[in-house]
Amino acid sequence: MEKPSLDTIVSLAKRRGFVFPGSEIYGGLAGTFDYGPHGVVLKENIKNLWRRMFVEERDDMYQVDATILMNPRVWEASGHVAGFSDPLVDCSNCKKRFRADHLEDANTCPSCGKHGTLGAARQFNMMFATKAGASEDEAATVYLRPETAAGMFVNFKNVVDSFHPKLPFGLAQIGKAFRNEIAPRDFIFRLRELEQMEVEYFVRAGEWEKSFEEWLDIMHRFANKLGLASDTVHELEVGDGDRAHYSKRTVDIEYDYPFGRKELWGLAYRGDFDLSAHQNGSSVSLEYQDEELKEKFLPHVIEPSVGLDRTFLAVLLAAYREDELGGETRTYLALPAHLAPIKAMVSPLLKNKPELVEKAREVRAELRKIHPAIAWDDNGNIGKRYRRQDEIGTPFCITIDFDTLGETPELKDTVTLRHRDTGEQERLTIAEAGERLRATLS
């Protein structure tokens, strides 16, 4: 099938409770979206997979959760106060504003088409500033963090002093970041409030290449576990002129979105730039004491950076399917079972038959001993329930009918188990249905 359009995904995401426009009843706010009940669970499942693969399966990782508000000197040292900006131009005719580096023609307004109406470029800092405490003076200015990485760098010394890790080791963090984007767009791809999952991995200067390849492999395995087809995920080796001046290598992991091939994640070798900047800015030594070699030095850093919202969008796009079933076109999300917000739905064939409802609730209670995400759905006829669960990405629908109760004696205590991806149904005992669920989730 053809790849779904962005509008198709946006519609499904709202219809099935994955993502809603932010502040919708007030007309919304550009660059903001709220995650609904199923979106929250899917997002948590993505986080848990990342945490397992990037942190828990390793012996050299330490998690931190740094504050969103930090001493403003942090951002001065990191260069964000002076350099976290985009060049903007204004059109004197239509009064619209544009990124200067995104214009195809620097002399023509892309909105109104007028020639010679674009002014000189000026820098616009993308950090959100606010005030700490009751004071309104300049000294009270603090920023909503534009990235999560700084929180790990400023806690480097704390972790070393508390845990005495041997190199190489890494810090990991999941958290919100805020960027005053000029033109947030493409649904949840470019947001003003976003969530990041990042690692800062500290190595000796001469050993970075091996670790870089190791993290690149982990990122590709992560993409595979998310259900992203290998032919939609690409590596872009960032050239010398486009890399940060301190980076010897940067690889962008790109994904084929409906609006083009765009950056999904990034992997960068940052040298000792960050620790050096914060050591100079704080006047506190961040050198690592190697007890075996009796050396003190600033470790170098490899940074695998994953944007959670962009990943969420890629997962929905990769899972979207349309096919013909029962003479009708249906839509379903072929989510990997470990990501699906609902693992199975249990339903009585008829909701107005107390004996069916009671038995269905018993079956659901048993299945929830295997996994808590077992949904109940008795709204509408059974066909509508199936279609609804298909669009949520539920792997199995389990129906309790009169045969379950013994109307056909040899079928007593059996259920109908329906498979999401094929629509096929099979008759299993309640115990067998539980084992099928357990095997799928293992």
Q: What role is predicted for each listed range?
A:
Residues M1-S442:
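NTP/phosphate- and nucleic-acid-binding module
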